[in-house]
């Protein structure tokens, strides 16, 4: 089954995490690149001009802001992170950003999905052509959401103890292994000593 872009957020016995996966049929020539306190989705070498064909394919997918990790499938990662940095709570930062930026105006009306987590709470959200949803993530029950098919948060058993394991898991572990067209993945993991980042490729 093809889910498009996928993100997961939550806590397990090892710590807190956000994870993100690019699955793509139209623009598979992409990679994830770690920068300072962020991970960017960018075209691979030789395909840089793809951004002129589709403005939605390059963006920061993860941002770290203090004790908070933000993850999304587009430029709203930065909008949410900036609001969190100014002191806005996670629910409102996600909700206002999704409402303002709306779904992507491409041929498929691709939804924008997002999540954020800190030491005390986590929220996940989506905006589609039909509406907006932001909900609290249950404590110790990780959830995931995607741009297609799984457009509501779904509980998942997320087996990871590091950012490397989290990126690997959303790319091809557990139930995620059944989802088609994986390209690249990234994750942030906090084991109590702060956030660390990692990426994985197919």
Swiss-Prot record:
It is an enzyme of class 3 (hydrolase). Signal peptide: none annotated. It catalyses: IMP + H2O = 5-formamido-1-(5-phospho-D-ribosyl)imidazole-4-carboxamide. Its EC number is 3.5.4.10. It comes from the Archaea. Keywords: Hydrolase, Purine biosynthesis. Belongs to the archaeal IMP cyclohydrolase family. This is IMP cyclohydrolase. It comes from Methanothermobacter thermautotrophicus (strain ATCC 29096 / DSM 1053 / JCM 10044 / NBRC 100330 / Delta H).
């Amino acid at each position: 089954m093809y889910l498009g872009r996928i993100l997961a957020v939550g806590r397990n016995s090892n710590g807190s995490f956000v994870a993100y996966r690019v699955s793509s049929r139209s623009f598979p020539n992409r990679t994830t690149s770690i920068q300072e306190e962020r991970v960017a989705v960018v075209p691979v070498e030789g395909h840089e001009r793809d951004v002129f064909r589709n403005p939605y394919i390059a963006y920061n997918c993860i941002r770290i802001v203090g004790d908070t990790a933000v993850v999304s499938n587009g430029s709203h990662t930065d909008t949410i992170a900036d609001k969190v940095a100014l002191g806005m709570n996670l629910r409102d930062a996600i909700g206002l950003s999704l409402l303002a930026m709306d779904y992507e105006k491409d041929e498929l009306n691709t939804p924008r999905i997002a999540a954020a987590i800190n030491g005390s709470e986590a929220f996940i959200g989506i905006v589609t052509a039909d509406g907006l949803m932001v909900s609290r993530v249950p404590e110790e029950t990780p959830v995931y959401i995607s741009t297609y098919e799984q457009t509501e948060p779904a509980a998942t058993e997320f087996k990871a103890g590091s950012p490397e394991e989290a990126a690997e898991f959303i790319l091809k572990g557990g139930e995620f292994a059944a989802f088609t067209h994986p390209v690249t993945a990234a994750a942030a993991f906090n084991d109590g000593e702060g956030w660390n980042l990692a990426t994985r490729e197919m």
